[in-house]
């Protein structure tokens, strides 16, 4: 007779299985396990008296014979592709297999071989996600990188050279600074990439930045986002296969949103803070989220719309864009960008999948450690205010969760040409993974892996007899040190710079990898679960936003999950 175990006891031993539901942090979001790749009665688990022991769940296989380097056991995987339970095998810094781990000599159906060289990470009762990607970074200070890593971000793309005033406001890196920044990247356990300045009316200056290692080009209004600059930048980007990100002209000095759309001429472009509070044609830049060639994204200060959103934005904007509260024109500029109507509409546009990406805008009207938190707060607010999505098929929030996790994992990776390496829990991709306790999901990771090695984790007193005594706080782990630091992460650059000998010229230790397929091969339709293109109208007097004729409005939140309950200090 097979042994029977209660569902509760099974979940306590091996984690939830098909049909079980898990609450995400203190939100109203509930996921349900759709599929379990493990085998009942043959589960592997590490520990005293458990399964992964010699001759039992551990085989005699060497690495050469197929044993993986690390196995993550019985994890609940939350990914754009689905919500399911599986063992995950890591090998040579990549995801080697997703399925059933164990010893093929004694167990049936094994797809991940556990051998004597295999390390074990206990995923029972835990959630595993891809590392996050933040595609809107101002490299104002290097300390941002550790802050982002500890929040579950494993790739940062942006521009700048430190607290220079150009970097405080924009993410546009000049050619010499690009090379110097790439040299500095050896010091950081993080996948990194740089954007060059896209504001030029002739090709040569942009080409020099791409050849210096820019993975993308950024058009920013503070440098003059004119129709001529837009057209030239996209023309060069098409030639070199790099993405263009745009922050449009808030003051409408060189044209209106229609002029910008005309200058883009149907070419693929990533529109930053498309709602407009972070910058862009006032009051109607949000209209471009209905264009099939525009990939719209948000920065996290407006995520989600709360009773405090408007008040904090005015001060943020004055500081970030070098404005003076004593100059009336500067105050008028700032006030033109902050509109409660478009911010409220942004919540709903995210929920219906019309906005595709969420990023931070780090220290330049954004919080680098809150990309995940703000994403899930938005999802929670929308469930409370709008109810279940029509796409849901069960008594769960699986589709909504898949839509929202795509906004900071796979979609920015696709938009910026790195989805062949990162962005999802997928065989063959880099093992840049984050393990979460469900009660702390999206807030405080339990473990962050880079290239298959542990880079960060909460850790107690190093002098204690066990790892858990206070003070417990996030600390860098071994993937943040020595040669492993440069072997466990990469720098993304343009293919043209690699062809031009950038790696040899700079002599950096980190591997340089090329971005690819960011021009005609992708569009809004490439944004997984977030590809809707409604017709957007903005009333120029009231700022009311309509999508396909329907008014988009919602109340500001007065209370949010994932907030003070998790941060006592």
From Swiss-Prot:
Ni(2+) 1 binds at residues 136, 138, 218, 361. GO terms for biological process: urea catabolic process. It is found in: Cytoplasm. InterPro entries: Amidohydro-rel (IPR006680), Metal-dep_hydrolase_composite (IPR011059), Metal_Hydrolase (IPR032466), Urease_alpha_N_dom (IPR011612), Urease_alpha_subunit (IPR050112), Urease_AS (IPR017950), Urease_asu (IPR005848), Urease_asu_c (IPR017951). Transmembrane segments: none annotated. GO terms for cellular component: cytoplasm. Its cofactor is Ni cation. Its EC number is 3.5.1.5. Ni(2+) 2 binds at residues 218, 247, 273. Residues 131-569 form the Urease domain. The keyword Signal does not apply. Binds 2 nickel ions per subunit. Carboxylation allows a single lysine to coordinate two nickel ions. It comes from the Bacteria. Pathway: Nitrogen metabolism; urea degradation; CO(2) and NH(3) from urea (urease route): step 1/1. It holds the Pfam family Urease_alpha. Belongs to the metallo-dependent hydrolases superfamily. Urease alpha subunit family. PANTHER family: UREASE. Heterotrimer of UreA (gamma), UreB (beta) and UreC (alpha) subunits. Three heterotrimers associate to form the active enzyme. This is Urease subunit alpha. It comes from Agrobacterium fabrum (strain C58 / ATCC 33970) (Agrobacterium tumefaciens (strain C58)).
């Amino acid at each position: 007779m097979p042994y029977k175990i209660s569902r509760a006891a099974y979940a306590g031993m091996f984690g939830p299985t098909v049909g079980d539901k898990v609450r995400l942090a203190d939100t109203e979001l509930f996921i349900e396990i759709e599929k379990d790749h493990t085998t009942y009665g043959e589960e592997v688990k590490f520990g005293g008296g458990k399964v992964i022991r010699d001759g039992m769940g551990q085989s005699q296989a060497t690495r050469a014979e197929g044993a993986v380097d690390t196995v993550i056991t019985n994890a609940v995987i939350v990914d754009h592709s689905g919500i399911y339970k599986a063992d995950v095998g890591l090998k040579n810094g990549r995801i080697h297999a997703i399925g059933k781990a164990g010893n093929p000599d004694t167990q049936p159906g094994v797809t991940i071989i556990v051998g004597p060289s295999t390390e074990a990470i206990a995923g029972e009762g835990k959630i595993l996600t891809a590392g996050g990607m933040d595609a809107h970074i101002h490299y104002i200070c290097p300390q941002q990188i550790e802050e982002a890593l500890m929040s579950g971000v494993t790739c940062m793309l942006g521009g700048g050279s430190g607290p220079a005033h150009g970097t405080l406001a924009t993410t546009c890196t000049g050619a010499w600074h690009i090379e110097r920044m790439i040299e500095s990247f050896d010091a950081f356990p993080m996948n990194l990439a740089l954007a060059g300045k896209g504001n030029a009316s002739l090709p040569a200056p942009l080409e020099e930045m791409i050849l210096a290692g820019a993975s993308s080009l950024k058009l920013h209004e503070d440098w003059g986002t004119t129709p001529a600059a837009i057209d030239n930048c996209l023309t060069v980007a098409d030639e070199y296969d790099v993405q263009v990100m745009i922050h449009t002209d808030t003051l409408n000095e060189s044209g209106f949103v229609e002029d910008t759309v005309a200058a883009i001429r149907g070419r693929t472009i990533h529109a930053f803070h498309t709602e407009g509070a972070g910058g862009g044609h006032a009051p109607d830049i949000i209209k471009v989220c209905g264009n099939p060639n525009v990939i719209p994204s948000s920065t996290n200060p407006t995520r989600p719309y709360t009773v405090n959103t408007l008040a904090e934005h005015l001060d943020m904007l004055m500081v970030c864009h070098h404005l003076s509260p004593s100059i009336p024109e500067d105050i008028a500029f700032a006030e033109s960008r902050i509109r409660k109507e478009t911010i409220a509409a942004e919540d709903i546009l995210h929920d219906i999948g019309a906005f595709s990406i969420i990023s931070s805008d780090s220290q330049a009207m954004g919080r680098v450690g809150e990309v995940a938190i703000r994403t899930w707060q938005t999802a929670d607010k929308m469930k409370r205010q709008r109810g279940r999505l029509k796409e849901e098929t069960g008594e769960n929030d699986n589709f909504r969760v898949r839509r929202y996790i795509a906004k900071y994992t796979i979609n920015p990776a696709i938009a910026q040409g790195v989805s062949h390496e990162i962005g999802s829990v997928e065989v063959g991709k880099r093992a840049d993974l984050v393990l979460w306790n469900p009660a702390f999901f999206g807030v405080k990771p339990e473990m962050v892996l880079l290239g298959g090695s542990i880079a960060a984790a909460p850790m107690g007193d190093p002098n204690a007899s066990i790892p858990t005594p206070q003070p417990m706080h996030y600390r860098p782990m071994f993937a943040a040190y020595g040669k492993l630091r440069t072997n466990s992460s990469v720098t993304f650059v343009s293919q043209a710079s690699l062809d031009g000998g950038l790696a040899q010229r700079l002599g950096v230790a980190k591997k340089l990898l090329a971005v690819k397929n960011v021009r005609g091969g992708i569009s809004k339709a490439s944004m997984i679960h977030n590809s809707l293109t409604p017709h957007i109208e903005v009333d120029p007097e009231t700022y009311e936003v309509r999508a396909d004729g329907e008014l988009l409005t919602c109340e500001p939140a007065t209370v949010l999950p994932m907030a003070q309950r998790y941060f006592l200090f």
